Amino acid sequence: MKQTDPNNLRIPALKLLLELMPEGAQAGIWTFGRYVNNIVPVAEVDGVWREQAKKAAVNISSLGLQTNLSGALNDAAWGLSADSGFQQSIILLTDGKLDMAKAGAADAEQINAQERKKLMSQVLEKYRVAGANVHTLALSDLADKDLLQEIALETDGLYSEAQDAESLMKAFLRAFDRAVPADQVPMVDNTFVIDDSVNEYTALIFKHSESTQETAILTPSGERWSELKHPKSVRWHQDIRFDLITIKQPEAGTWIAEANLDPSNRVTILSDLALKVDGIPATIFPGDKLDVEITLTNNGDVLDKKEILSLTDMSITVVTASGLEGSKVLSDPESPPVDGVYREGLNRLKELGQYQIDVIAKSRTFQRKRSFATTMIKPVEITHGFDEVKGVYRIEVKGLSDNLDVESSRVIAKIKSPDDNTIIQSVAFDEQAQAWVGNIEVNKGPGQYRVDLNVRGVTQSGRSFKIKPEAIIFDLPIRSASAESDIADQTIVDSETARKDTVAETEVS
């Protein structure tokens, strides 16, 4: 951490989570290098626990030289239970690779391989049995991203990356949103609307490092509150990087935050009128179809009254890792869903990386929003090319994780030859290559071939995935490198001859 977080910015990031932690939750904090330290024991979150946790967070250091991932997750699993009554989650941050071997040890590779096996087969089993999620966060490229993706995948957690300490806080926040989901109200240009069903709201306002602007809140009745001047009923936590303002029984109407504009500014609420969204997992694969179901609930009961839903606009917005954005209106005032369930299939997600999916409900009397981060990962790598020695076109599908259950996984190939005939065949697993290998022979004549793969994978824990990669299209026969070189040489000779002929003709004329 000395290299990736020299200014200990993970401390204010942790403090933000401590402030956001809901009253009545159970929480604890562990740090780890070679050894694991439970610096804040698991206990019920209240004002006393929060202050103790913030004091302990200040003493977090970067002295650890090793990365005892298996030990940390094993200790943190203490007390987890399928019948705990809680939504159980771990947020794991590391900038290193699993490393339990002493420096210079000759058997370091073997020791670390054993630790990895123990982690995947024994430690994570505790989380799977308890139904607990591990949300993993890789700080910089030094972290073992493949392993952190596996941990998140095996426990239905979210995998995130923070390339530097500056982006760490918002990455922490995305993981926290998965661990402690909450309703929000939409915030546009730092303006938001609170309705009379809201019992409490918490506004998170980020500060820009170069800004000296004081954060203030303007109430619907025109009062101006700041960190220095606000009612006693308002809890205002100020940090060098953010303000967190909690207001109980807020006035209904339009509120304004006088602060820097930041896309991560947001307002979470407590209200009996809630937006419920199902079908957006934390980890997805290329080709996945997400069957999203959205309902408005009041005291847990689904709202299905036509007179309410016909006046409610429901929309969904998807933002890809590269920033591409698409939105769709799901509601039809003339024909709201009879059962109160809005259904939408998302099936064109192909870009690897982290997506942001927002669902927004707006009516004349209320507004609600739910935000989800989901990460698309690539579970297999596909390579292909012509094998000149065997005279075949070779396609290889290799799992990127050693946690793949080879016996239960399948690769199917649909091959279309130049004569337009199509065959479907299973691709065999090659033990030596540790991959599914298919060899396509030139037995249907020269021309264009097309191969569509269907990969159905299963992890050791039983988590399944299906992906349909882009079609592999190639022409056979493929010229060898020497043949290509001969053609290139002949082209040069022909070109040179043509040039001399042109010069000769010019001289004659």
Residue locations for each model-derived region?
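Von Willebrand factor
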Residues: 1-44, 69-77, 81, 86-94, ...
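VWA/integrin I-like adhesion module and closely mimicked acidic/polar interface patches used
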Residues: 59-63, 94-155, 162, 167-175
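C-terminal "exit" segments of structured domains
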Residues: 159, 163-241, 246-248, 256-260, ...
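Short, compositionally biased P/S/T/A/G/V-rich stretches that sit at domain boundaries
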Residues: 185-186, 267-289, 295-297, 371-391, ...
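Aromatic sugar-binding surface patches on proteins
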Residues: 232-245, 251, 334-345, 430-439
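Surface-exposed, short loops/turns at beta-strand junctions within beta-sandwich domains
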Residues: 248-251, 347-354, 440-449
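Short beta-strand elements
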Residues: 272-274, 365-391, 463-499
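Beta-strand-rich structural segments
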Residues: 289-302, 314, 391-401, 452-454
